[in-house]
C-alpha cells in the first residue's frame, strides 16, 4: 500500500501540522514493516495521485492562494482507484471545512464534537464554546466569524477521529528538538521526553495558571480574561519565560488550563509530564483520541460559565492528598501512549485501521 501525504514543506514550524505528522514519523519503521510506504509531498502535481491513499493536511490548503481551483482539481482527478482523506489538523473541535467534507472520502479530525449533529448548526466564533459565550454573555467579536453548517446529514458519516496533539513531544526541550529537526531532518529528534516529575514530588506552590489573554476574537479571550480576574487576588497569571514556566509547573499541585483557539492546549500535556493535577473547562462535549480527559479521573472540570470555578478550586486545595491520585492516573495514561513499550505499536495499529476504514 502506498500513502501520499500532502503538506507544507515547513510543517515543522506549524504546531498543528507538526503535532499531526509527529507520531507518523516516530512510528514510520513499524508502518513500513506492515507493507505501507509513506511519501511526504509538498507541491501540487499529478504525482500526488500515484498512491492508494492521499491524505491532505488542512494547513496546506489554508495557505493556498487559489484554493477553489485546487478543490476543482481534486474533484476532477478523484476516482475510486484511491482513497482521499482530508486531515483537519486544527486544535479545536469546530469549524469543519465543509468545502472539502462535501467530496472527500474521509474527514479526519483530532477532536470532534460528541454530538456530531451540532455541526449542522452555525457556531458564532466557529466553536461550540465561543457560541456558548455569545449566547450566555452576549460577547461580541469585532472580527465576526460564524462556522459554515453541514447541510447534508449523511456527510457527518465521513467524520472520523484520528489523533490529537498530545502524541507530540511536550517535554522541556521539545522546542529545541523541533528546531534541530527542521534543520537536519533526522528522525533521531522525533522522540517523546522520558524526563518527568512524579505527582508525589514535593510541591511548594498550590496553583499555576500562566496564560495569555489577548486574542483576535473576544469570544476566545473571554474565558481566559475571566479566569485571570477570578485568580488575581491569589496568584500572578502573567506569562513567564519557558524554563521559568516549566519550573513553576513542576513545583505546583494544580495547573489551570483554559481553552485557547482550541479546547486542547500544550499546557495540558506539560501538566501530565510535570505531575501536576489538571484543572480545565469541562471537556464532556468532545471525543478525541487518546482520550486524556475523563472528569475526576484524569482531570478536574469546571463549568464553562465559570460560576463554580472558585468553589471547585477551593475544594481542590483542601483535598489535595485525596485528589492527587487523579494526577497519577493522568500521568500514567500519558506515558502509556507516548513512551510506553507498546506506544509505537498502538499508534501504528490505529493509523492502519483508520486507513483501511
What do the predicted segments below correspond to?
Residues 239-357:
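Catalytic binding pocket for nucleotide-activated donors in carbohydrate/polymer assembly enzymes
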Residues 2-266, 279-295:
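Nucleotide-sugar donor-binding catalytic core of glycosyltransferases
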Amino acid at each position: 500500500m502506498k500513502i501520499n501525504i500532502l503538506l507544507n514543506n515547513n510543517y515543522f514550524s506549524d504546531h498543528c501540522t507538526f503535532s499531526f505528522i509527529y507520531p507518523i514519523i516516530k512510528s514510520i519503521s513499524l508502518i513500513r514493516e506492515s507493507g505501507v510506504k509513506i511519501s511526504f509531498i509538498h507541491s501540487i502535481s499529478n504525482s500526488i495521485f500515484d498512491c492508494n491513499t492521499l491524505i491532505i493536511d488542512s494547513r496546506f490548503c489554508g495557505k493556498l492562494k487559489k484554493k477553489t481551483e485546487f478543490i476543482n482539481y481534486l474533484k476532477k482527478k478523484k476516482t475510486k482507484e484511491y482513497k482521499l482523506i482530508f486531515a483537519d489538523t486544527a486544535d479545536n473541535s469546530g469549524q469543519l471545512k465543509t468545502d472539502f467534507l462535501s467530496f472527500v472520502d474521509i474527514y479526519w479530525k483530532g477532536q470532534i464534537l460528541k454530538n456530531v449533529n451540532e455541526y449542522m448548526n452555525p457556531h458564532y466564533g466557529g466553536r461550540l464554546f465561543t457560541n456558548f459565550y455569545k449566547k450566555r454573555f452576549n460577547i461580541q467579536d469585532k472580527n465576526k466569524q460564524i462556522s459554515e453548517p453541514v447541510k447534508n446529514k449523511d456527510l457527518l458519516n465521513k467524520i472520523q477521529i484520528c489523533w490529537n496533539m498530545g502524541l507530540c513531544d511536550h517535554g522541556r526541550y521539545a522546542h529545541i528538538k523541533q528546531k534541530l529537526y527542521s534543520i537536519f531532518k533526522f528522525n533521531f529528534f522525533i522522540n517523546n521526553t522520558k524526563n518527568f516529575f512524579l505527582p508525589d514530588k514535593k510541591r511548594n506552590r498550590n496553583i499555576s495558571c500562566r496564560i495569555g489573554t489577548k486574542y483576535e476574537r473576544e469570544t476566545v479571550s473571554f474565558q481566559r480574561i475571566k479566569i485571570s480576574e477570578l485568580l488575581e487576588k491569589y496568584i500572578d497569571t502573567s506569562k513567564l519565560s519557558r524554563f521559568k514556566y516549566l519550573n513553576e509547573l513542576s513545583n505546583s499541585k494544580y495547573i489551570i488550563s483554559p481553552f485557547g483557539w482550541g479546547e486542547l492546549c500544550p499546557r495540558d500535556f506539560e501538566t501530565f509530564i510535570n505531575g501536576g493535577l489538571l484543572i480545565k473547562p469541562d471537556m464532556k462535549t468532545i471525543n478525541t483520541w487518546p482520550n486524556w480527559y475523563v472528569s475526576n479521573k484524569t482531570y478536574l472540570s469546571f463549568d464553562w460559565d465559570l460560576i463554580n470555578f472558585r468553589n471547585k478550586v477551593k475544594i481542590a486545595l483542601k483535598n489535595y492528598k485525596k485528589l492527587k491520585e487523579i494526577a497519577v492516573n493522568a500521568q500514567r495514561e500519558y506515558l502509556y501512549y507516548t513512551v510506553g513499550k507498546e506506544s509505537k505499536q498502538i499508534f501504528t495499529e490505529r493509523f492502519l485501521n483508520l486507513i483501511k476504514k
